Amino acid sequence: MHWSEIIADRIIKRNPNKEEYVCAAGISPSGSIHIGNFRDIATSYFVVRALIKKGKKAKLLFSWDEFDRMRKVPVNVAAIDSDMEKYIGCPYVDVKNPFDTEEKTYAEYFEHEFERSIVKFGINMDYRHQAEMYRSGKYTEHILHSLKKRGEIFDILASHRTQPVQEGEREAYYPVSIYCSECGKDTTKIVSLSDDCTQAEYTCACGHKGSFDFTKDFNCKLAWKIDWPMRWMYEGVDFEPGGKDHASPHGSYDTSKDIAKKIFGYEPPLFQGYEFIGIKGTTGKMSGSSGLNLTPETLLKIYEPEVILWLYSKTEPLKAFDFCFDDGILRQYFEFDKMYSAVKDGTANDAQKDIMYNTTVGDRELETVPMGLLVQLGSVVDFNVPMLETVFEKIGTPYKSEQFSARLDKAKYWLENCAPDQVNRLRAGRNWEVYETLNETQKAEIKSLFEYISAGGYDLDELNKKLYAIPKEINGEDLDEKALKTIQGAFFKNVYKLLIDKEKGPRLYLFLFAIDPQRYVGLLDFSYPKTEEEAKAEELAKVEDVVENEDKHVYGEADAFVPFKDEQVSIDAFEKLDLRVCEILKAQEIRKSHSCLKLTLDDGSGENRVIVSSIKSEYTCEQLVGKKIIVIANLEPARFAGVQSNGMLLAATNGACGCQVVFVPDCVPAGTQIK
């Protein structure tokens, strides 16, 4: 049974005769809504579908928490309008729209952006706009009730925290924030409340002092852990998921659950915590308010909506999975296609059927043209659709444009924006630099292939056999199997390098058969000398390589000089530090961290050392492996993102250069002490 059906059964068991079940989700429009938030929606959506599958009426209630205060300005928003910080403290619904669009407010802009992408998933939601709910007075009686119960609410909150209650803290607590009538911000403090809890006096950080009548003035909002259970009660919510941080002991759900029962007299909904989403192949903290985010719309440029839903459906909520911007996406498409086809042809098991049940988008029928094949062959024909149709016809898979055009767009976007190193393009001229490194036997292999291709008259199977036969024909028939495989592998690499400047590419026999031989056969012909044009092209390529390898980072101005510390350190104190040269053997991304890398080091002791460093935004793993660095080796171990770090590397951080690790010349042995 699918995990969503297990949850649905629990919901029905709690209240078997309810007319309509309510599954909830909600997001604050702090910026572009990132894909991590989408798990909130997907989890509730699948439970709604499971309830409907069981013959029940159910809806997905979605709250736009646009009445929340603006906490900070996302980086991408600040880049458009540097004056947005003045809105910090105002509700999102009152913040201006900094973009040149028709939406009236900041909240509306990001809400519409997200809603447009949700339509593409075929998900129907019943929207609640919390600013309208509060300001229309619909929550007034519950706000008054909360004010009357403020002492009890404080006691519940205090029971879920570790720090002791300070004297006078309970008396000064109010479960509601007032938005100032003068500046519009929530930087207010209630200084008095009438006995019937209807009238309040408040002061604001802006200097304004005012009166507030909770029966007539609605520009106020309950604190999060009171607002949440109040809305459960108001909407009759039966189920709501949340990030695993909310699910922790004494976290938001535990606290709100107690408030729902003891303050609002409502049995809290079933809650399902979920693991956060990982991102492979890109960096940057994934959050809406930081500006470094990956929205559903962004993912839809490389993923079909069904594949995104499939990833959520096949993964239990408390298990992590990754969206892949590297070639892991090709594996995901392959696995999706395999399961989709099994369901379609009737060979799927019950578990596969349950997973795929949640992935349908309206009446869409998918064509499972292999994404890997589109990636491999698409770039070779410059994503020309008629040419690709011809290629597919030649290799015995006669897909038509209407079958692959949608996926082809995603393959092209992925290659050009996420994996440009995997683009396969034929060279403009012969690769003399590679050819001149070959020995005579290898050159003879290339000549044999050139002659075979030039002669033509072969089919796909004959070409495949010939590619494996050429090394054997040139090197002799008496090679053992291991030696033959080594020579064949080297031959394939040489052909790839001569044709596309890479050591590997699409399956070679498909590649050579699919493309018009006249486009590439000349690249294998070294029977005449290097031309003047080829010599000039080589020189130009060397210059371009130098330019390409120059530092591409764009930094700002240097930080202001920080005065030296007054406190001096004695030689004895300095000698307590054990600074060692270490070689980086392995660098790995840490799934739970958006900024840290796990580095495995050779510290000269004979046993590897592991440290964690927040340099992910500055260096790729490939750039670090093999480098030598300086590490404080006797630093007290500490845990970061679930990994124990046994030391700290030395690096310089400045606005003019970012974070630059101090590297050591390769001639210095690992384990050398810095004295």
Please state what every model-predicted region is:
Residues 1-78, 229-248, 603-607, 612-625, ...:
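N-terminal catalytic cores of NTP/NDP-binding nucleotidyl/phosphoryl-transfer enzymes
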Residues 123-296:
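Active-site cores that bind ATP or allylic diphosphates and position pyrophosphate for catalysis
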Residues 373-390, 439-521, 526-528, 632:
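Helix-rich, typically C-terminal accessory recognition domains appended to large enzymatic cores
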Residues 81-103, 107, 114-117, 121:
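A glycine-rich helix N-cap at a beta->alpha junction
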Residues 1-19, 212-224, 581-589, 599:
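Conserved oxyanion/phosphate-binding beta-strand-loop segments in alpha/beta enzyme cores
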Residues 536-675:
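Phosphate-backbone binding interfaces of nucleic-acid-interacting proteins
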Residues 248, 253, 275-420, 500-540:
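Catalytic adenosine-cofactor/nucleotide-binding cores of aminoacyl-tRNA synthetases and other
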Residues 391-453, 460:
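Small-residue-rich helix-loop
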